[in-house]
Amino acid sequence: MVEELLSLLHALLDRHQALCMENHQLLKQLRLLVCERARLLRQVCPPSCPVPYPSRFSGESGRLPEFIMQTMSYMLANEEHFCNDAMKVAFLISLLSGEAEEWVMPYIESNSYVLGDYQAFVDEMKQYFGWGTDDEDDGDDDEEEEMEEDH
């Protein structure tokens, strides 16, 4: 019985040694493959962003819709860099200048909650700088009222 157990133990030790050697060879191959992959990746040029970098916004209300669309498109095309609302708001702030830059300073100084809430930040911008379609909607209402008065 003891001899059978010793024989079984030797067989297990031999198998263990063979598996360790195989594991060592596989790790060696893996290291070579990782190095080869890194070498090949260095040769590949990353694709350029299909969406141009947005222009700065200085506070012209007529440009706000264009600015928001440009920044949204850019963030969608580069979403790996804009993983949360705070990153999106920080990106918008980095593109502000002039009156718009002055407007955002109190939010930054008071560490306002809108700095971490993209939609709230955009809503604040719309409220302060105006949104181009609001003026157009008012004009349409006036035209409808004039048409009703004529009939």
UniProtKB/Swiss-Prot annotation:
Keyword Repeat: no
Acidic residues bias: start-end ranges: 133-151
Signal sequence region: none
A Gene Ontology cellular-component term: nucleolus
InterPro entries named among the record's database cross-references: DUF4939 (IPR032549)
Region (Disordered): 132-151
Pfam families named in the record: DUF4939
Predominant localisation class: nucleus
Localization of this protein: Nucleus
Similarity comment text for this entry: Belongs to the LDOC1 family.
Name of the molecule in the record: Protein LDOC1
